[in-house]
Amino acid sequence: MANSSPVYDWFQERLEIQDIADDVTSKYVPPHVNIFYCLGGITLVCFLIQFATGFAMTFYYKPTVTEAYSSVSYLMTDVSFGWLIRSVHRWSASMMVLMLILHVFRVYLTGGFKRPRELTWVTGVVMAVITVAFGVTGYSLPWDQVGYWAVKIVSGVPAAIPVVGDFMVELLRGGESVGQTTLTRFYSLHTFVLPWTLAVFMLMHFLMIRKQGISGPL
């Protein structure tokens, strides 16, 4: 590379970063691609906003049935820009779901799920399910009336499943009734299990897209 800096030369010698840059910038983009093909990327941006704002809120949120609601109220009223952080978190959550739905429709209508991209579609469906789980678990964390009854209803749904239904309900609730253990489990799922699971499937999804490229027009 002409007129390269010593810092660039140092990294280039060890990591060959120019090859990576060339691969990224020279990837072929089909001429039929339009703005609707950006919906998946917008969904990713929403997730990153969720991750950042959610991480910020963990500094103040207390996952106990006695302090959860008051800690959220404290965040909204006393913490500098706390109201903005939580509001952005909620808005981007809604936007993420909307962009995900539109992205799924775009992929389906343009045949992006067909051979050889079946696994890309499968990972996308898994991520859609995880996103719904994000909404369910996050809705409960303020532990207000809406959150409590939402948890009680959602965690009771598996009871209709034959044989394993009661076991699944108890597994979700951490006992026979909704309480502290339930909130702890939902908090753990929302802040640790689901984000990292989604990140793994996102990586798989993007690597497959990178390998196979964007599907052609109908």
Curated annotation (Swiss-Prot):
Protein keywords: Electron transport, Heme, Iron, Membrane, Metal-binding, Photosynthesis, Thylakoid, Transmembrane, Transmembrane helix, Transport
Compartments reported by the entry: Cellular thylakoid membrane
Cofactor binding: number and manner: Binds 2 heme b groups non-covalently with two histidine residues as axial ligands. Binds one heme group covalently by a single cysteine link with no axial amino acid ligand. This heme was named heme ci.
InterPro entries in the cross-refs: Cyt_b/b6_N (IPR005797), Cyt_B6_PetB (IPR023530), Cytb/b6-like_sf (IPR027387), Cytochrome_b_N_euk/bac (IPR048259), Di-haem_cyt_TM (IPR016174)
Binding site for heme b 1: 103, 205
Family matches, as PROSITE patterns: CYTB_NTER
Main location: membrane
Molecular function (Gene Ontology), one example: electron transporter, transferring electrons within cytochrome b6/f complex of photosystem II activity
GO biological process: photosynthesis; respiratory electron transport chain
NCBIfam families registered for this protein in UniProt: PRK03735.1
Official protein name in the record: Cytochrome b6
Gene that produces this protein: petB
